[in-house]
């Protein structure tokens, strides 16, 4: 549904002569009729489902939209994948789905539960071929749209300050290539029902990341560029977890 990122991806892929056999298609996962048309036309063997609303504070104000896209949109894609006998369905989830404290995390957890339950139902009730549903959980992807690094870069370019919500807030990070690798490996290795979590090492304090970026820009923390603490936003955790308590 995001037209501009789709356009940029189209342009990037067209620069690779050996990878010209693709067709960008605009549509929303919440539009079941449109998605059915796409499945019927292209008959995919693999579905990588990454469509979601992801910004925690924004979704606190629009829970109905988060449910519509993150839960019902995922249900549409999962149901159609099973109907059109897709071989594997990889659902891209988030560490915010673990013991969720906000709307976005709760909707992603609900979507995880649907995908896993659907896989179990198909395994139990269909002895012949059925779609295998696999889940991957991401931390924060460095450099992705709306992530903290591009924000800090913009704030640095404007002379600061760099805004951090809390001095103790930490996050897990992974790079874009690592995120892509996790999704592709899950699609290859998964046999249905698994939840794959990438080893992202130790969590990073956001204030330390801010200090490091200031130093890398050749500036001094507190002299040239200030760090400003703005307070935790609605639904925001001090730290994220990778695995559920249960």
Protein language model regions, located:
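A conserved pocket-lining segment of Rossmann-fold NAD(P)-dependent short-chain dehydrogenase/reductase
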Residues: 128, 151-174, 178, 182-206, ...
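Mid/C-terminal beta-alpha module of Rossmann-like enzyme folds, strongest
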Residues: 189-246
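Hydrophobic/aromatic anchor residues within beta-strands of the central parallel beta-sheet
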Residues: 24, 66, 89, 133-136, ...
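NAD(P)H-binding glycine-rich loop region in Rossmannoid oxidoreductase-like domains
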Residues: 29-68
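The catalytic Tyr-centered alpha-helix of NAD(P)H-dependent dehydrogenases
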Residues: 103-107, 141, 175-176
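Adenine-nucleotide cofactor-binding loop residues
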Residues: 30, 72, 139, 170
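Conserved Rossmann-fold NAD(P)-dependent oxidoreductase catalytic core, especially the SDR/UDP-sugar
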Residues: 53-113, 117, 123
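N-terminal Rossmann/SDR dinucleotide-binding element
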Residues: 1-43
């Amino acid at each position: 549904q995001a037209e501009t990122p789709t356009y940029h991806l189209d342009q990037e892929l067209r620069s690779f002569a050996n990878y010209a056999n693709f067709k960008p298609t605009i549509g929303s996962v919440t539009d079941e009729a449109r998605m059915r048309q796409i499945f019927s036309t292209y008959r995919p063997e693999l579905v990588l489902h990454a469509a979601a609303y992801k910004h925690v504070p924004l979704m606190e104000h629009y829970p109905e939209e988060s449910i519509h896209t993150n839960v019902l949109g995922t249900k549409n894609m999962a149901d159609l994948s099973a109907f059109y006998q897709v071989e594997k369905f990889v659902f891209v989830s988030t560490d915010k789905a673990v013991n969720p404290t906000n709307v976005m995390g709760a909707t992603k957890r609900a979507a995880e539960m649907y995908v896993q339950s659907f896989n179990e139902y198909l395994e139990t009730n269909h002895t012949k071929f059925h779609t295998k549903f696999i889940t991957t959980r991401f931390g924060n992807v460095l450099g992705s749209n709306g992530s903290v690094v591009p924000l800090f870069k913009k704030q640095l370019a404007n002379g600061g300050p760099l805004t951090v919500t809390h001095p103790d807030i930490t996050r897990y990070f992974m790079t874009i290539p690592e995120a892509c690798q996790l999704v592709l490996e899950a699609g290859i290795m998964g046999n249905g029902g698994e939840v794959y979590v990438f080893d992202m090492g130790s969590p990073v304090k956001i204030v330390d990341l801010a200090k490091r970026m200031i130093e890398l820009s050749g500036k001094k923390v507190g002299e040239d560029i200030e760090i400003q603490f703005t307070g935790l936003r609605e639904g925001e955790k001090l730290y994220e977890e990778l695995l559920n308590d249960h």
